[in-house]
Amino acid sequence: AAKPQPPPPKPPSSVPFWLGNASRNFYGTGPWSKDPLQVVWSFETKGISGRLHKDPWGGSSWPGQPSVDEKHVYFGSADGRLYCLDAKDGSLVWTYKTEDSLKATPTIVGDRLIASGLDHYIYCIDKNTGTLLWKYQTGFEVDCSSAVIDNRIYFGGEDGYFYCLNLEDGALIYKTERLGSMEGSFSVADGRAYIGTERGDLFCLNLADGSTVWKALIGADSDSTPAVYEGKVYTAAENGYVYCFNQTDGQLIWKYKAEGGTGKEKSGIWASPIVVNGRVHIGSSNGYLYCLTADKGEVVWKYQAKGMIWGTSPLVDGRLVFGDKAGWLHSISADDGKEISSLKIGDNINATPAILGGRIYIGAFNGKLYCLK
């Protein structure tokens, strides 16, 4: 008799880290609605008067994503609060106030949330109640989204150090020598972390002790989270270049320059590359989302948005979803770059969507967090 087949694996029921996991390559789950994009609910946060900007600064999850589990959405806001909302209707479950804006994606690990912000602290919060378990002080702002592996928390700081803390009590396990200010996040593959710096370096670090395995020159400030794919490391920088390096030794394989754009940003890239099926997908300040071949960096297609693209574009079930600085959310076909649906939801979307069960969670600069389908 035929052996009974094991039940099919359940799709993941959470997006717990920035870009899904420590390797930054789980982008979410469908299924997608057959209808055009529509707002299911929105939640309004408060603003903060402009310490970084002349205008009052609002907005959520810049430049990260919310994190989402089976029932709740967690995100940090420019108003200095960490929020937990009911994913179904956007109602407030709890809020935790810090001393300054929060930019990074909160990391969900078990019953804990790891959050970090511009007040120099890393916070460990009980995700069910919103109460503080511990906090750890760094030397400067922490925009980098953390990752937790085997009860160790890893993150890079704008103070130039890469840190490893104990999840239980926040005790320091190690911090590296000063590498350069890290505003972007990192990805983990094969026991190593890959992270770019403001100085224009790409580091490959040994996670066990933080030692440098190799360093490659990008040559410009990089806020991108590197993507590791089939023995190569992909990243981008504010000079408008997308780079591909050898994962083993950091040798440059190719680079591609996005052209055009206006203002001081021109074609600069703040987004992170999404590498799937032999293709690299990334948006630029010139308003285009590019699809490049992963092996040679040649353009497959490009899509013109309504404004600059600073957020990253997760790819789920054949669709890329991303916002632009004109306030539009776009859903396009990853196959050929053709628009499926777009909707103006806010003013200035710097953030990246989290996608779970075909629902899209994204923050905008108007201080609102949106759920769309």
Regions found by a protein language model. Name each.
Residues 78-87:
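Beta-propeller domains
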Residues 86-89, 126-130, 166-170, 206-210, ...:
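Short loop/turn segments that connect beta-strands within beta-propeller blades
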Residues 22-24, 81, 121, 161, ...:
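Short glycine/acidic-enriched loop and turn motifs that connect beta-strands
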Residues 9-12, 42-67, 94-109, 118, ...:
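Extracytoplasmic beta-rich repeat domains
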Residues 5-47:
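Blade/loop signatures of beta-propeller domains
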